Amino acid sequence: MFFKGIMYIIYMLAVRIKGIKYSYLKKYKGNEAADKFVEEIAMKWSTYTIKTIGIEIEVEGKENIPTEPCVFISNHTSILDIPILFKTISKPIGFIAKKEMLKVPVLGYWLEKAHCVPLDRSNAREAVKSISEGVKNIKEGFSMVIFPEGTRGKRGRVGEFKKGSLKLATRAKALKVPVTIEGANKGFEDERRFKPCKVRVVFGKPINPSELSKEELVELATSIREEIVMNIKENGLNWCDNSI
């Protein structure tokens, strides 16, 4: 794993240098060409990361991913959730992420180019701006991923969804797709080191907000969390911070 780690660092440095090509494409070929290049970088990076660590991914409900831009609402188990979702969704996506994530060398640079939106929960005004930016991304054709727990769950547990965490999903008026990630925490978070693991990703049926009553919209976060918890319990696991 030490040798793989060295090779991965070299790979990431090479990926950062490709930012030169991104700048060229954006300036001379336009946003569409630049965005396609970012999508290519994201897919190659996620594939390389998953292969290097030795992650086996089982995907269920791939057919539930809409062709149009949507909001993916997922539990958050590990930093590996990002490459796993890039790989399994296989379409242009951005993340609503803690502002600290966009400061990570190399990764932060490309997350920003991939239309990821930094979120500062301690600043209400900036949080509103972030939501507006996420809505704008969806209108421009980019799906967004939300982690309503606001932080990674310990040992894969599903934490409570933060109050107001689905404001983007509500304002965007786009389809909402519940996503369950199970097992990624074993690839890093549990022992704070990378190691091979098996991951299960489940895409639930899209939720059309226009078909929901006001009461159902209010309870949307709770119902999606319940769906995620039940998907995990199907495997005989009880990874929930609170019983339902």
Predicted regions and their residues:
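Membrane-interfacial terminal anchoring regions of lipid-handling membrane enzymes
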Residues: 1-40, 57-65, 218-244
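Non-catalytic C-terminal accessory region of glycerolipid acyltransferases
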Residues: 2, 128-244
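Catalytic core of membrane glycerolipid acyltransferases/transacylases, capturing the structured
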Residues: 12-29, 38-39, 52, 66-124
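A short, well-structured juxtamembrane/interface segment
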Residues: 44, 48-69
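Hydrophobic alpha-helical segments typical of transmembrane helices
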Residues: 45, 81-84, 97, 106, ...
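Thr-Gly-centered strand-to-loop micro-motif
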Residues: 60, 96-98, 120-121, 148, ...
